[in-house]
Amino acid sequence: MTIDDRKIKILQAIINDYIHTGDPVGSRTIAKKYNLGVGSATIRNEMADLEDMGYLEQPHASSGRVPSNKGYRLYVDSLMENQLLTPEENLKIKQYIIDTAMLEVDKIVRQTSSLLSELTNLTCVIQTPSVNKSFIKSLQLMKVDSTTLVSVIITDAGVMKNHIIRVNSTPTIEELNKINAVINRRLVNLCIEQINLQVINQLKEDLQGYDELFNALLTPLYETLKNAADSPDLIMEGATNIFNYPEYNDIEKAKEMLSLLNDKESLRDLLKTNKDITIRIGEENYKPQAKDCSIIAAEYSFGDRPIGTIGLIGPKRIDYSKVISIMAEIVKELNNILNNQSK
């Protein structure tokens, strides 16, 4: 059996209605609310065919139909229409651009997560920038007092790492300028993951005569490398939003969702994407705790290099068209903000 134009229009109407009401949809509802040019008896027969084809499900014998995972997938891939942002949504995004223009990267990411959660009424999870793929833009030693220095490591993505260094006696300002020049000549434009024992030994040769300072400098370098090897952190906003949907009045579904939101490793796996926007529905999420939800994920980038991922988590009946429009616009602006900061 093939899915013809009439079945497609009926399926589209059912999914749109279910997304906005959360109630199983009957043939009379479609006949009354949508001008499809056919009566409820014809719609009922077509709905039975759509169920046989796997696009609809009937949760209870006496109820209407709801979309299946297969139905949602067809809807997302082929049937949903682009939705423009409202003036209020555009205004909030413009304010976000202004508010984050001069912030550090971690604060920008946190505000991004908060805005996405607010505008979509979903749970937002953002993977913070991955340091190991970043390049060192600057490493500066600055004198605090006669026995204390602070090292400031800045990556090309704007991530800053500060470390206090204790020595018996700090170099003079003139010596410090020379040392900074040597360090930056050796390390600037190196990817964090390229800093290996060979590079460290070369730096040691460059800093002959400053053995105490070199040994002290190893600590912040080691910490930076260790942080790079660690899994990127996750920022979550709107964790309770998802429980406003009646689907999660079911205690078992609520437990599964709580389990997922507390499982950082699973969340990192589910956020993986190599596309502008990835949509996974139900069992496409390949994690048992996520089988009843949808996850929309997108990369954000510094230049052409992806540095993190944004994910929105909600029930399968989320308003895909609206959410995708909001996600695409905010990711675009986030990329612009990060790239403008580097100039």
Curated annotation (Swiss-Prot):
Signal peptide: none annotated. Negative regulator of class I heat shock genes (grpE-dnaK-dnaJ and groELS operons). Prevents heat-shock induction of these operons. The gene is hrcA. GO terms for biological process: negative regulation of DNA-templated transcription. This is Heat-inducible transcription repressor HrcA. Belongs to the HrcA family. It comes from Clostridium botulinum (strain Alaska E43 / Type E3). Keywords: Repressor, Stress response, Transcription, Transcription regulation. The keyword Translocase does not apply. GO terms for molecular function: DNA binding. InterPro entries: GAF-like_dom_sf, HrcA, HrcA_C, WH-like_DNA-bd_sf, WH_DNA-bd_sf, WHTH_transcript_rep_HrcA_IDD. HAMAP family: HrcA.
